[in-house]
A protein has these predicted regions:
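Catalytic beta-strand/loop signature of glycosyltransferases that borders the donor
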Residues: 218, 271-277
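A C-terminal functional module that forms or caps the active site or interfaces directly
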Residues: 234-268
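Conserved N-terminal catalytic core of the sugar/cofactor nucleotidyltransferase
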Residues: 2-16, 22, 36-126, 133-134, ...
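A structural signal for short hydrophobic beta-strand segments in well-ordered beta-sheet cores
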Residues: 31, 176-179, 272
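Conserved core of the sugar-phosphate nucleotidyltransferase
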Residues: 135-224, 228
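Hydrophobic packing residues within well-ordered alpha-helices of enzyme cores
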Residues: 69-73, 141, 234, 291
Length: 310
């Protein structure tokens, strides 16, 4: 592993979406031990990112999580990579907008990334705090970002196969992607209630409409590669969202929908990068044992040391 001071200032930044409350899982799942020596999923994410050439990590968190993250997460690897924090709060809104009465739910991942704007320098990846993406995913995305001019609007996402990202214990939210013959994203459909169904899957929309899925569709697991040019467009999209939905108690502005809109407008392209890595995550408490077993198998096969941080 390299040290923080030896990493190039032009290395990509890893931005971690960690402000979620973990409502379905019933706890602060981002710092729940999963590895053989008490490692968290976040530990493996940072470990894989650092060995793929990422030079900084920015955690987007709620202000009341800061002490837990500094002591329970960042302290273990802050000597290896630069660590910073950005705070997502309900009242961080563009001029002219306010929080509606009774609103407690965060505004979503588009808002989270906007909250980290001042902490991001150069090209950056975005990941969920509670998803295990695998070594190859970081290598593929890190290589793409390292070779991308920071003024480019040719962005990327790592695509996983839908059937390999489902939970046996309930529904999941996935961005289901359609790509062209060259592997560029055409559309992305944020489906929020996907479950296994026969040999495939199905999603139930809010109005009760059921969408049949084969299970082979590429899906976004919120592993994205961007340049700072994203911010030229993101506040406009968030403003449009607030104008349409800002008075609602639970509506969210998802980054997959924002990217899909920009692709549709011709303002950007998004290459879907394929990976050999297996994805797994903890959506429900019952998923934890599966994740622990998967990590143990990777350690046994030499993908990771039994103790990540020495």
């Amino acid at each position: 592993m390299t040290t923080a001071t030896s990493v190039s200032a032009m290395s990509p930044t890893l931005v971690v979406l960690a402000a979620g409350m973990g409502s379905r899982y019933g706890g602060l799942k981002q710092i729940d031990p999963m590895g053989p020596s008490g490692e968290t999923i976040l530990d493996y994410s940072v470990y894989d990112a650092v060995r793929a050439g990422f030079g900084r990590v920015v955690f987007i968190i709620r202000p009341d999580f800061e002490d837990a993250f500094r002591d329970g997460v960042a302290a273990k690897f802050s000597h290896l990579v630069d660590v910073d924090f950005a705070f997502q709060t309900l009242d961080r809104l563009p001029t002219g907008f306010s929080v509606p009465e009774g609103r407690e739910k965060p505004w979503g991942t588009t808002h989270a990334i906007l909250c980290a704007r001042d902490a991001i320098r150069g090209n950056f990846a975005v990941i969920n705090a509670d998803d295990f993406y695998g070594r190859d995913s970081y290598a593929v995305l890190g290589k793409y970002l390292a070779g991308l001019d920071d003024t480019s609007t040719d962005w990327s996402m790592v695509g996983f196969t839908l059937r390999n990202t489902l939970s046996d214990h309930g529904t999941v939210a996935r961005g289901v992607c359609a790509t062209d013959a060259n592997g560029f994203l055409m559309t992305i459909d944020e489906m929020t209630s996907i479950e296994r169904h026969g040999a495939g899957a199905r999603n139930t929309r809010g109005d009760g409409t059921v969408v049949a899925l084969s299970g082979d569709e590429p899906v976004s697991m919120n592993m994205w590669g961007f340049t700072p040019r994203l911010f030229d467009h993101l506040e406009r999209i968030f403003r449009e969202f607030l104008t349409a939905h800002g008075d609602e108690a639970k509506s969210e502005c998802f980054i997959p929908l924002a990217v899909g809109q920009l692709v549709g407008e011709g303002a950007a392209t998004c290459r879907v990068l394929r990976t050999d890595s297996s994805w797994f995550g903890v959506t429900y408490r019952e998923d934890k044992e599966i994740v622990q077993g998967s990590i143990a198998a990777l350690v046994a096969h030499g993908e990771y040391p039994a103790r990540l941080w020495s």
